[in-house]
Amino acid sequence: MNEEYWILEVKVTPKSRENKIVGFEGEVLKIRVTEAPEKGKANEAVIALLAKTLSLPKRDVTLISGETSRKKRLLLPKSTESIISHWREHGL
């Protein structure tokens, strides 16, 4: 399977009250997760939340940079780009 991919920039707030996709700040998607930023738990929560929301298997959401930062870059299937663009333009 040779599907094209694109990069989504996200800003993560760990140790929040709930797992939630908040919305956009410019071109960056803001996400809150309940997990602490320890041993990759917050990263795993971000991947799980996006995968569930976009109806993707977790293996299709790949962290490519920002492993220890609040600002992260994720690789997503090209098929999700129109969904994310809709969120950006019309809200979640």
Swiss-Prot record:
Family indicated by similarity: Belongs to the UPF0235 family.
Pfam families: DUF167
SUPFAM superfamilies linked to this entry: YggU-like (SSF69786)
Cellular component annotations (GO), alphabetically ordered: cytoplasm
Name of the protein in its database record: UPF0235 protein CCA_00247
Top-level taxon of the source organism: Bacteria
Database matches in InterPro entries: DUF167, YggU-like_sf
HAMAP family: UPF0235
